[in-house]
């Protein structure tokens, strides 16, 4: 067990899978000689060679297309079974605009056959990546760039897999529930700390994966607190939070003491300007205000 950043946990998990299974390879822009834009694959080409750590041209279509063909032929690229894992660095905090700071997980969550993975902790980043690489289906692994070096925690040294569809209680509480994933887990945590001073106990449920998602854990939290806020960085319309809210309304309506509340990004492209990006991404004060509104019911 050692303390590692979110980025280090991803790197270690990827390296372990490549060491144990020679069919696993990495392909992407600057992943080889340069070690990746964020240095996740630093040193990989020296250890595994240029045939397993492949620098691709600046064409996402070519990368995914190559992965698809390799998977069909029996390899396990990191894209009947098509075992592809597509690593998708995403999320705001770096002023990357609509090209690099978006959270498009909901765009893929409605496509049958794809698995959508959104780790929030270093331990889950490693374990969920191992599960994704060994899964027989295409997996979209959303790693939030803002967490790379910001979050650090104990991570087991040995190889392990974290199961899909099993939510994690990030913080137990009795009065309000926040359902979230990815970097928003920590936004919710900061907001909950402020409400704790008011004597309001907030439960934070980290979904970990959106496809499959842990409906049972969500409903249990709803029945425990009866007041629910769904929080995500994706836009409001069509965001996965709408699916969660609809399921709660269908299956736990009588357990609610207040309408399900959603806090999301607005329905606009992600701005480049840092102040505008901050206004776009849900902030701690937004969550605090939403939770206080719910607590008044």
Where in the sequence are the language-model features?
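The start of beta-strands in P-loop NTPase/AAA+ ATPase cores
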Residues: 23-24, 138, 201, 227
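Conserved beta-strand scaffold positions in the cores of enzyme catalytic domains, especially
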Residues: 53-55, 116, 140, 204, ...
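Thiamine diphosphate
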Residues: 1-137, 278, ...
């Amino acid at each position: 067990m050692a303390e590692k950043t979110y980025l280090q946990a991803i790197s270690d998990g990827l390296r372990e899978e490549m060491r144990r299974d020679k069919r696993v390879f990495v392909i992407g822009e600057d992943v080889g000689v340069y070690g990746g834009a964020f240095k996740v694959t630093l040193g990989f080409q020296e250890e595994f060679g240029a045939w397993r750590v492949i620098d691709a041209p600046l064409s996402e279509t070519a990368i995914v297309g190559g992965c698809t063909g390799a998977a069909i032929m029996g390899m396990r690229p990191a894209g009947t079974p098509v075992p592809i894992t597509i690593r998708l660095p995403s999320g705001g905090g770096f002023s990357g605009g609509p090209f690099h700071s978006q959270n498009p997980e909901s765009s893929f969550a409605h496509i049958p056959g794809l698995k959508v993975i959104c780790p929030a902790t270093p331990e889950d980043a490693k374990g969920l990546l191992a599960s994704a690489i060994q899964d027989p289906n295409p997996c979209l692994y959303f790693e939030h760039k803002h967490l790379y070096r910001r979050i650090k925690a104990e991570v087991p040294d040995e190889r392990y897999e974290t199961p899909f569809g099993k939510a994690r209680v990030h913080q137990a509480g009795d009065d309000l529930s926040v359902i979230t994933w990815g970097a928003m887990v920590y936004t919710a945590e900061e907001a909950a700390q402020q409400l704790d001073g008011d004597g309001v106990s907030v439960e934070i449920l980290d979904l970990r994966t959106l496809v499959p998602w842990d409906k049972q854990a969500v409903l249990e939290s709803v029945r425990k607190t009866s007041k629910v806020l769904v929080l995500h960085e994706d836009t409001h319309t069509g965001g996965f939070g709408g699916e969660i809210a609809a399921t709660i309304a269908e299956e736990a309506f009588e357990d609610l003491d207040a309408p399900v509340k959603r806090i999301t990004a607005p329905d606009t492209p992600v701005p480049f300007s840092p102040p505008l990006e901050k206004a776009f991404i849900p902030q701690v004060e937004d969550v605090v205000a939403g939770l206080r509104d719910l607590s008044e019911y």
